[in-house]
Amino acid sequence: MCECKIDRRKLGSLLVCAGSFSLLPGVARAGTVTALAITCIDYRLVDADMRFLDGKHLDHDYDQVSLAGASLAGVSDKFPTSNAAFWDHINISKQLHHIKEVIVLDHRDCGAFKVAFGSDYKGHGAAETAQHKAVMEQVKAKLATTHPDLSSQFYLMALNGKAERVL
């Protein structure tokens, strides 16, 4: 006969714990999300980024990585480690969570764009949009070459949280 002393509480805890193991295969299989969202690190837009993505009906259905400059991180030689991270995260998200789409969310008045472009930075209106669009087009072209199976969307967000689709 066993000399172990297990009271009712411990027995109940053991049964709950043992029962929860049956849920693990389902959790392991639930590793698919629709998209990878690549946003800028700017603290001013963290909440706006989340609201925007949730508004696209992606609530709990996307991976997210934040890199200075968002699209700029994917192609600028000014930030080589961010460049590698940009593409590594697409590869990882695709491998682990089988993403189907990449959503890139730049924003206006971006410090990373100011650093990368220096005196050539276009800070307002249509010129700023065109500068972001040119960078986004480079990312889109590279994405089409490296991951032709992934669709993409590119947005430019104002500091008030309103985003416009650029590509």
What are these regions (language model features)?
Residues C2-G19, P25:
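N-terminal secretory signal peptides and thylakoid transit peptides that target proteins
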Residues L14-A18, A30-N83, M157-A163:
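Short, conserved "active-site rim" segments that organize catalytic pockets and cofactor/ligand binding
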